[in-house]
Amino acid sequence: MDQDALISKEDSEVEREASGGRESLSDVIGFLDAVLSSEPTDIGGDRSWLHNTINTLQRPGSTHRAKGEGEGEVSTSSTQDNRSGEESRVSGGTSEPEAEAHARNVDKQNIHWATGRGASTDSVPQDLGNGRDSGILEDPPNEGGYPRSGAEDENREMAANPDKRGEDQAEGLPEEIRRSAPLPDEGEGRADNNGRGVESGSPHSARVTGVLVIPSPELEEAVLQRNKRRPANSGSRSLTPVVVPSTRSPPPDHDNSTRSPPRKPPTTQDEHTNPRNTPAVRIKDRRPPTGTRSAPDRPTDGYPTHPGPETDATKKGHRREHIIYERDGYIVNESWCNPVCSRIRVISRRELCVCKACPKICKLCRDDI
């Protein structure tokens, strides 16, 4: 019996603590609801109605408990406290109409300032929690004296006249043209860019369209004359090909270090006097033809000397030089062309002349082809 009484007593204490926690929570919720649903006022405004609400919520007897003899505590509903708080707030609000009007004007100015600064206007009415429409005001009064922009007025005009927007869409004009900002001045753009002079890239710039002109013949001629007066670059190469005279390589038995014919072995007087030791070869007469200078005798060292030039009657200035000597028992007749257009070179009998004019002019070179 005692154990059952102890258990019932503990249960009643637990219920009392739980009901007390719920009542305190309901009081806090009612106070927060009253504060959030009320309109804000300025710093110097009257807040007596708020104190009345707080006093009403904290008034003793707002939440009364009825305790029976054999029963636990019974708490009343918290809706009565909330209703009493709202009634007191309404009574306090009606008693101060001037404070509410002043607070409403301050709220309108704050909304208009937030609209001009680009901030979201939906957050302001939502935080106020006055239960009214949270959209933008139709035409807030310009009490603060803030200047209105042309784009804002135009948006209001377009919203008021939907037919005008339909006409623009029918004509094919985008809506951004009416709201686009004016093109910045060239001087202002350069000043804002710290003197770098970056021009605007808008296609509607008058400076850009002024450059696009139709070229005239006079303009083209002036450009050509200016290009001709420019000095030629010294580092550029000339496109004219340089003709390099081709030289023919000498025969294998010819020595490039000397301009003389091949060396002839020395001969003695006994070879000419003794017919038994000499071959039966007729020695050609060394006398030059008529009209030429006589060639000197062959020196004893075997090196021939250049005789005088042979003048050709067909062309003046072209001559042919030759020499005849004996080598290894054979008579060698070497000749070379000496035109004015090339250097003197010793050539053999069966070799083409280095100058291409010899076969046509020289009589001795015609058989070499």
Swiss-Prot record:
Major location category of this protein: host cell
Subcellular location: Host cytoplasm
A matching Pfam family: zf-Paramyx-P
GO-annotated cellular components: host cell cytoplasm
Residues with the Phosphoserine modification: 249, 257, 260
Example GO biological process: symbiont-mediated suppression of host cytoplasmic pattern recognition receptor signaling pathway via inhibition of IRF3 activity
UniProt biased composition (Polar residues): 50-61
Stretches the record annotates as Disordered: 1-24, 38-320
Annotated positions binding Zn(2+) 2: 341, 353, 355, 358
GO MF term set: metal ion binding
Keywords: Host cytoplasm, Host-virus interaction, Inhibition of host innate immune response by virus, Inhibition of host IRF3 by virus, Inhibition of host MDA5 by virus, Inhibition of host RLR pathway by virus, Interferon antiviral system evasion, Metal-binding, Phosphoprotein, Viral immunoevasion, Zinc
Entry's family note: Belongs to the paramyxoviruses V protein family.
Comment, domains: The C-terminal zinc-binding domain is involved in binding to IFIH1/MDA5. This domain is also involved in viral pathogenesis.
Quaternary state and interactors: Interacts with host IFIH1/MDA5 and DHX58/LGP2. Interacts with host IRF3. Interacts with host RIGI regulatory protein (via CARDs domain) and host TRIM25 (via SPRY domain); these interactions prevent TRIM25-mediated ubiquitination of RIG-I and disrupts downstream RIG-I signaling.
Name this polypeptide is given: Protein V
Provenance organism: Sendai virus (strain Hamamatsu)
Taxonomic classification: Viruses, Riboviria, Orthornavirae, Negarnaviricota, Haploviricotina
